């Protein structure tokens, strides 16, 4: 028979699958040389160890790598050996002999084959603790994974929030820039509107050429200007004024004049500085003299008022005023009556400010013609006109276009002074403000 490599012979016998500690313990107990320190009991179910000190020093080193009795006892306990307590040892009196007895169910004298049934104890508590630890570890790992996933989600959310915050800050910056630009634009618009309002105010833009009244006694003042009057281009070009006679020789010495009556002349474009100078001169002349309306008699009411003013008392003009014949002819031919129709045909000119005198100038020619018609009876009393013309027809039905130019001039010299004098007195009693024209914007 072949020997089992795991078997060890014990006293001529063999045992298989027996731990080395049990084999050494069986040899140690069976050795008769060590019976004084370790031996079987009388029954053969246990063994005794005497004098543990000597046994640890003399016997243990021969079979084991240590000489510690506590380690030997611990190994016995690992294989299921138990300590047997005697009645003598349990008493209060210490026994005279140091004797320790150990026993096991399968460690019997003469039954070596039972050693195979002796197994090393496995700690059940340790296995349970190990299982608990593994469960805890798995739970811990799961919780760690959950925490990691939550942390990743939080990081992603934080990243999104950072991006959104950056976008919001950019939008805020752009909105601030737009707001500042809008504020600048609004400030510019407000400044522009205020400048336009100030420029359109009467104190700034309304400073037009307000010439003095040519038919004034020095006491009346021009009325306030009006805004947004529509006037045609023709009415601006055909402006006329009536100037009172003056006795100043320096201003009228070179002009050829006609004795008697005021001067009616066309007004061209005059700069603002010259208009202001004329206004100041006219105001000074009003303070110095009275107005001369008519030298020769025209009508009873007008004659009485004109005779009280001497001709040489005024310093404005030294010679009688001049009445242009072409002007009188245009009045007689009815140009003033067609002036409204021509205004309607011409494009309208929007004027921000026009003095009140301009409106009176627009209607001055028509008023003159009406005055001429109203004073037809006074003109019939004129002897020079009665000798040359027949007044069977009304004045508005006369055909001045077919009349001889010489007759027209004589008629004008005879009729106009009386009509103009009456017209001037009516303008003083009412609110007639002739003007010297104005410059276009």
Swiss-Prot record:
Organism superkingdom: Eukaryota
Main localisation: nucleus
DNA-binding interval(s): 17-121
Annotated compartments: Nucleus
SUPFAM superfamilies, per database record: Winged helix' DNA-binding domain
SMART domains, per the entry: HSF
Region (Hydrophobic repeat HR-A/B): 130-205
GO molecular-function terms, A-Z: DNA-binding transcription factor activity; sequence-specific DNA binding
Keyword DNA-binding attributed: yes
Alphabetized InterPro entries for the sequence: HSF_DNA-bd, Vert_HSTF_C, WH-like_DNA-bd_sf, WH_DNA-bd_sf
Knockout mutant characteristics: In knockout animals, the eye lens grows normally, but during lens differentiation, denucleation is impaired and the degradation of mitochondria and endoplasmic reticulum is suppressed.
Gene Ontology cellular-component annotations: nucleus
Gene3D superfamilies for this protein: Winged helix-like DNA-binding domain superfamily/Winged helix DNA-binding domain
Tissue: Predominantly expressed in the eye.
Keywords carried by this UniProt record: Activator, DNA-binding, Nucleus, Stress response, Transcription, Transcription regulation
One example of a Gene Ontology biological process annotation: regulation of cellular senescence
Role this protein plays: Heat-shock transcription factor that specifically binds heat shock promoter elements (HSE). Required for denucleation and organelle rupture and degradation that occur during eye lens terminal differentiation, when fiber cells that compose the lens degrade all membrane-bound organelles in order to provide lens with transparency to allow the passage of light. In this process, may regulate denucleation of lens fiber cells in part by activating dnase1l1l and dnase2b transcription. May be involved in DNA repair through the transcriptional regulation of rad51.
Family affiliation: Belongs to the HSF family.
Protein's name according to its UniProt entry: Heat shock factor protein 4
């Amino acid at each position: 028979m072949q020997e089992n490599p795991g078997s060890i012979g014990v006293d001529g016998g063999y045992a298989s699958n027996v731990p080395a500690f049990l084999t050494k313990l069986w040899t140690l107990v069976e050795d008769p040389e060590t019976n004084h320190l370790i031996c079987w009991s009388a029954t053969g179910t246990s063994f005794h160890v005497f004098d543990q000190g000597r046994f640890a020093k003399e016997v243990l080193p021969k079979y084991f790598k240590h000489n510690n009795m506590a380690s030997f006892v611990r190994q016995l306990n690992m294989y299921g050996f138990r300590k047997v307590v005697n009645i003598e040892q349990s008493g209060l009196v210490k026994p005279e002999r140091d004797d320790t007895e150990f026993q096991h169910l399968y460690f019997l004298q003469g039954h070596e084959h039972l050693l195979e049934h002796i197994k090393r104890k496995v700690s059940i508590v340790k296995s349970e603790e190990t299982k608990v630890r593994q469960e805890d570890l798995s739970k811990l790992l799961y919780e760690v994974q959950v925490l990691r996933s939550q942390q990743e989600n939080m990081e992603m959310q934080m990243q999104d929030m950072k991006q959104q915050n950056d976008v919001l800050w950019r939008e805020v910056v752009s909105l601030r820039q737009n707001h500042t630009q809008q504020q600048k634009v609004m400030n510019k618009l407000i400044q522009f509107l205020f400048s336009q309002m100030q420029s359109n105010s009467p104190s700034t833009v309304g400073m037009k050429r307000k010439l003095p009244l040519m038919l004034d006694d020095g006491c009346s003042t021009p009325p306030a200007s009006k805004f947004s009057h529509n006037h045609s281009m023709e009415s601006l070009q055909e402006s006329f004024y009536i100037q009172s006679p003056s006795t100043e020789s320096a201003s009228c010495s070179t002009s050829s004049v006609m004795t008697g009556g005021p001067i009616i002349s066309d007004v061209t474009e005059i700069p603002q500085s010259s208009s202001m100078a004329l206004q100041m001169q006219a105001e000074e002349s009003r303070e110095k003299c009275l107005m001369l309306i008519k030298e020769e008699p025209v009508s009873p009411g007008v004659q009485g008022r004109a005779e009280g003013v001497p001709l040489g008392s005024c310093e404005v003009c030294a010679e009688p005023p001049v009445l242009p014949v072409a002007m009188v002819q245009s009045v007689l031919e009815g140009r003033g009556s067609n002036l409204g129709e021509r205004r309607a045909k011409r494009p309208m000119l929007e004027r921000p400010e026009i003095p009140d005198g301009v409106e009176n100038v627009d209607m001055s020619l028509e008023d003159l013609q009406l005055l001429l018609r109203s004073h037809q009876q006074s003109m019939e009393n004129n002897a020079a006109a009665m000798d040359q013309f027949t007044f069977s027809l009304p004045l508005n039905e006369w055909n001045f276009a077919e009349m001889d130019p010489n007759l027209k001039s004589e008629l004008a010299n005879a009729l106009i002074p009386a009509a103009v004098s009456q017209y001037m007195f009516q303008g003083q009693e009412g609110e007639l403000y002739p003007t010297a024209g104005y410059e276009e914007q």
